[in-house]
Amino acid sequence: MWDQRLVRLALLQHLRAFYGIKVKGVRGQCDRRRHETAATEIGGKIFGVPFNALPHSAVPEYGHIPSFLVDACTSLEDHIHTEGLFRKSGSVIRLKALKNKVDHGEGCLSSAPPCDIAGLLKQFFRELPEPILPADLHEALLKAQQLGTEEKNKATLLLSCLLADHTVHVLRYFFNFLRNVSLRSSENKMDSSNLAVIFAPNLLQTSEGHEKMSSNTEKKLRLQAAVVQTLIDYASDIGRVPDFILEKIPAMLGIDGLCATPSLEGFEEGEYETPGEYKRKRRQSVGDFVSGALNKFKPNRTPSITPQEERIAQLSESPVILTPNAKRTLPVDSSHGFSSKKRKSIKHNFNFELLPSNLFNSSSTPVSVHIDTSSEGSSQSSLSPVLIGGNHLITAGVPRRSKRIAGKKVCRVESGKAGCFSPKISHKEKVRRSLRLKFNLGKNGREVNGCSGVNRYESVGWRLANQQSLKNRIESVKTGLLFSPDVDEKLPKKGSEKISKSEETLLTPERLVGTNYRMSWTGPNNSSFQEVDANEASSMVENLEVENSLEPDIMVEKSPATSCELTPSNLNNKHNSNITSSPLSGDENNMTKETLVKVQKAFSESGSNLHALMNQRQSSVTNVGKVKLTEPSYLEDSPEENLFETNDLTIVESKEKYEHHTGKGEKCFSERDFSPLQTQTFNRETTIKCYSTQMKMEHEKDIHSNMPKDYLSKQEFSSDEEIKKQQSPKDKLNNKLKENENMMEGNLPKCAAHSKDEARSSFSQQSTCVVTNLSKPRPMRIAKQQSLETCEKTVSESSQMTEHRKVSDHIQWFNKLSLNEPNRIKVKSPLKFQRTPVRQSVRRINSLLEYSRQPTGHKLASLGDTASPLVKSVSCDGALSSCIESASKDSSVSCIKSGPKEQKSMSCEESNIGAISKSSMELPSKSFLKMRKHPDSVNASLRSTTVYKQKILSDGQVKVPLDDLTNHDIVKPVVNNNMGISSGINNRVLRRPSERGRAWYKGSPKHPIGKTQLLPTSKPVDL
């Protein structure tokens, strides 16, 4: 009487509600259609052929059954009393011969022994292409066996009703035969449990002995046997739908049982005006149609309860699925977010998951069902103005949504039930929209927008040509500030040009460094970002280049105005509070403070090239070497502190302007808008410079750190004046570079390369005076300076590392740092793996043994010698030359320490370079012989210098955020540990290995390795 799909849905709902059994992907009637094509291709074979391809015989009361099955069961009925029937196996040779005869169509079963026929019957089921009990139902059938006895039988029989009709006929016939066999169990010893154990692997086609027998396998086999036993015991009820399921269907459909139409097609026929809609509706499953009414029959559940699946239906916002007649009441564009493929997939889920919705919950009589569903469906899928104000992107789609809302309001008022649903919607503030609605690139969205789309696309082309104007706009859109609750009232008042999500994906340029993200949806939003966002895309865009050219002067003028008023502690607090309040909400404050400390730390570590760029006024800026070479006990009130203050104050000033002065004209707007942008741009540029100058800086540090302090104090004033003269043109040049970078993003690599060369050329002069301020300690300023430095370092580290919240931003930023940067490729040569010469390996083994013999003071001292890069020797001569170079460096240090009087007239740089060249010329004759004769005295003289180096360099390592250390010359303490201490001894071993030198190499017959002391396990040997 009822359509088979309706019956199946009612069965699935009942199984899920009463027994907790979910059935996924039941194919049902599709099996017959799938095998019909295969049936024509196969000839007269019997084994390994699907049921549809077999010859059938009509059996009264059972329908059409495969002829082989009928013949086999009829033959075995004559031998039903045979003991161990189906248990005893027949002869394998006879079975093969019998199978061949049957495949060739010979009727030989009547004369065959019963055990052979029984074995052939088992083989027939085992060789079916698909098990007669479909694999889709196996899990549900096994789950049903774990219920109580009565519930187990009912659930198993209900699951059998989900099978296709021809499968039901075959199962009913065969299990009825097996039941007759079990009724004669007193004679044949084969009751239903024994038969179930035998036939379960054949009917369910489990693996035959391939698995190891485990406890899980045994349990599974027992459950499978229980399934077959239940079907044997209740064979006559297989596939018979109970009456209480059939009685539910009229109530499910909301119609009278007496006037019920016999098919689903007749029920749906009059509902659609156009044939296209009717055809689409006929393709749709009745799952969404039926599921709501089935809630009435669930135990202990009232219709007012909204189940989880109903929420899913609401969130997906698809009126086509929510109600059968939503198409009639909603405007045409209501389903604009979904393609037909998406709709089909959702319908498929609704079909088999049977998601219960509240379509019929509010109806008291069956007649009012259609009115309720139309009104409720439209009200659920529509969004009230309160919702729009709270949660959705303000893009070009806003006018479209407002049109839809207006249309739906009219529909709801006409239905007469609008008042019932408005409080329900207003409580749901978080309606999650689907991705296709959010990023709608489809045809429907364009059609609804109408003529406004043309202007929008023209502006898209203009913006693509001038991408610079979109820097802050896309930044603020991406941060999520537009998601805040009160954006809608502000942005339309400002008359901003609206950008849809699809255009935004087209227009997104490379990310800026310091992009802020809004972490929470509930916290207070930043009004200043909204103001800038509203203004920027309109009239202010044309003034961009002028504002860019004006910006450096504005920044420099603002910074000294308030620098004297703020102590470092106030500065840090103010900076923290400003940055914390702008991008993050209240519950993220604890995270933000740690983040900002990291940001400031990375600022100080990335070097004063950043500061030289930012402050034109600070002509006496000292470079990175100052932070790195000076220890805390020697810090003083230097220009560096002013530098830190002005750097912070620029940001603080811009943020104050950003928040408080919103309407003071174009100059005010340029200050608010572009100073954070430039700060972020400097951050990126100085990171590149820091990479390029890292090797040069470390080399300079090695030279300067060994100078005596009294000599440096005498050179202090002259070198300071010299640097001030040389610094100012570089500052002007860097400011010009800064403006160029803001106006033209494409020139970034060029500017970075230019600034790198400048930094290299001027670094030798800058670093000469870096150590000059060591001799004037002032303890009162030390604490302030130290705390300021730590805050600066920690805060700036995280501004580059932790503010990128998206994976794509991480990848883009990382590629910008490591892969796509030509400057980094120039600095670092690729790794070359070569065969190590024998002598060099001997020298390394000797140096490691020598290292293990040193006292702890030597080991600590040698750890400081890590700044020089690892020298890769190509041959024996190359290794020798590298040793000579390292020895020359140390001998020059000793020369400087012994005789500073001779070098007083020189400047710092000239003295060091001259000393190195002179000592390298004299090395083979003097210092090398001295080292050969007196290695201990040389080591003793070098010990203090290496300790001093180690102290300084522990603070002086240049760390860059997001650094990729894969192809760097990685600084390793163990590799260079004997450069300063035992270089003379190594040279001696290389040139002329003596008897004592040969004795160092353990493992010879004279010196077996057992006598030596092994290296400590705590220190890994890195060769």
UniProtKB/Swiss-Prot annotation:
Record key words, sorted: GTPase activation, Nucleus, Phosphoprotein
Segments forming a coiled coil: none
Biological processes, Gene Ontology terms: positive regulation of GTPase activity; regulation of small GTPase mediated signal transduction; signal transduction
Domain Rho-GAP: 49-239
Localization: Nucleus
Residues where Phosphothreonine is found: T306, T323, T508, T866
PANTHER family, per the entry: RHO GTPASE ACTIVATING PROTEIN 11A, RHO GTPASE-ACTIVATING PROTEIN 11A
Protein's UniProt name: Rho GTPase-activating protein 11A
Origin species: Homo sapiens (Human)
Lineage: Eukaryota, Metazoa, Chordata, Craniata, Vertebrata
